[in-house]
Amino acid sequence: MASIVARSRLDRLRAICLTLPEATEERTWESPNWRVNHRIFAMCHEDATSVTMKADPDERVALLGSDADRYFVPAYVGSKGWVGVVLNSSTDWDEIRELVTTSYCLIAPKRLARAVQSA
């Protein structure tokens, strides 16, 4: 069972992801993930110590080069342009919102991505 802190982080992440158009939450590999059009745009483990998402290629390089304690290449999907971000007491949730939104726009159908980008 997740701790109170993990549930709080997971709730914040869930709120960010599910505000995006047509986003859904599913459980795969015993962990929550968020999808649009059946494609994953963000995922995390139940302990909510990190979130993994697709990143803009240039932004991914910048993130990975900026703080190795905070950003990392995730297993399995790192080679496909995804980045992991550690979630802890100093997490910048506005940044997480921006990164999740970017991931969503990279994964979502163009009409949904355009709607989010123009909002």
Predicted feature descriptions by range:
Residues 1-119:
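Charge-dense, helix-prone N-terminal extensions
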